[in-house]
A protein has these predicted regions:
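Active-site cores that bind ATP or allylic diphosphates and position pyrophosphate for catalysis
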Residues: 111-250, 257-261, 313-314, 319
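Short C-terminal domain-edge/linker segments immediately following a structured domain
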Residues: 69-73, 183-187, 225-228, 239-240, ...
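Charged/polar, solvent-exposed surface patches and flexible loops
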Residues: 59, 92, 115, 134, ...
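Short secondary-structure transition/capping segments
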Residues: 80-96, 120-126, 149-157, 277-293
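Sparse recognition of residues in long alpha-helices and their boundaries
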Residues: 42, 73, 237, 261-262
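N-terminal Rossmann-like or analogous alpha/beta NTP/dinucleotide-binding catalytic cores
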Residues: 1-117, 121, 212-213, 217-230, ...
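Non-catalytic terminal extensions that flank enzyme cores
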Residues: 1-14, 32, 37, 64, ...
Length: 319
């Protein structure tokens, strides 16, 4: 099988430096293997991801020199490449899992899920307590009169492990560390975990490059691959890009977004500085994606989060 990587951004705003680093690493990693690059737009939440944001994202990626072989504008055998247009695939998989008695309706509200008494992981994430796991048919019918349910996947009390291409060995007990997780929300929107597994498998993705914040999503996704009889890709997680004071970047951080950076820097200047922070550009000199190919190696990247020094992207002379 031809190696295939992808970048799959969510167009909820202008892309920021963290998004750019993700796309760059995915592009470099698969291009070094002479593989194909897919672009998929993860716009399941259409209210937060209007099409104009997707169009701007495509233009930004072109400007950065990060091209793709399949996806919006170039088409391909697995179109459409917008998740909002692929819901029939997700519906069929949900039905298959439901018929195996692996899915159940959940009527818990957000407030109930996040109550102080709810079980939490050490990192503060809420674990589902299994409140609706064993409802009777009568209870389900009664609760359905009051609100539409979400759909959750039953997980076993088992360890699921994998060896990440950069972070190394990782494992979780699905019941203890994850809990039964959502496949579809109560408003009908399919969950990321189901959609990403189905799309990566359908599109022949062999390598998934993404931020370390998604490392703990991998065991539950591997479980879904197993249940659905699909071949899982290799996973490579990279350290997160943080502000100087340790905050996660988001599309609300205007100083890290391309709307602020494009008027002041060339694409090569942005990529060169990001590559320097990530450890595979010996200095912060401007480099195109093509020029970075010869120096890129996963061995050069750190495993701990990367902080952007104060003023590093303030102006061209800040380095």
């Amino acid at each position: 099988m031809t190696p295939a990587g992808r970048f799959a951004p969510s167009p909820s705003g202008r892309i920021h430096l963290g998004n750019i680093l993700c796309c760059l690493l995915a592009w470099l990693s698969i291009r070094q293997k002479d593989g194909r690059v897919l672009l998929r737009i993860e716009d399941l939440d259409t209210a937060r991801c209007p099409r104009r944001y997707s169009e701007q994202m495509l233009e930004d990626l072109h400007w950065l020199g990060l091209d793709w072989d399949e996806g919006p504008e170039v088409s391909g055998p697995q179109e459409p490449y917008y998740q909002s247009e692929r819901t029939a695939l997700y519906e069929a998989a949900l039905q298959k899992l439901t018929e195996q008695d692996l899915v159940y309706p959940c009527f818990c509200t957000r407030a109930e899920l996040h109550a102080a008494s709810a079980p939490h992981r050490e990192d503060g994430q809420v674990l589902y307590a299994g409140t609706c796991r064993d409802l009777t048919a009568e209870q389900i019918a009664e609760k359905s009169l009051l609100r539409a349910p979400a759909q959750r996947l039953r997980v076993p009390d088992e360890l699921w492990s994998f060896t990440d291409g950069h972070m190394g060995f990782y494992q979780e007990n699905l019941a203890r560390d994850c809990g039964d997780f959502l496949l579809r929300r109560s408003d009908g929107m399919f969950a990321y975990q189901l959609a990403v597994v189905l799309d990566d498998a359908a599109m022949g993705v062999t390598e998934v490059v993404r931020g370390a914040d998604l490392l703990d999503s991998t065991p539950r996704q591997l479980y879904l691959y197993h249940l659905l009889g699909l071949k899982a890709p290799e996973f490579i997680h990279f350290p997160l890009l943080l502000t100087a004071d340790g905050r996660r970047l988001s599309k609300r951080n205007a100083d890290a977004g391309l709307d602020d950076l494009r008027p002041r820097f060339s694409a090569a200047e942005i990529l060169g500085r990001l590559a320097f922070l990530a450890g595979f550009n010996p200095d912060a000199s401007p480099k195109t994606a093509e020029e970075l190919l010869k120096d890129f190696s996963w061995d050069k990247l750190p495993r701990e989060d990367i902080r952007i020094p104060d003023g590093f992207f303030a102006d061209k002379g800040a380095v």
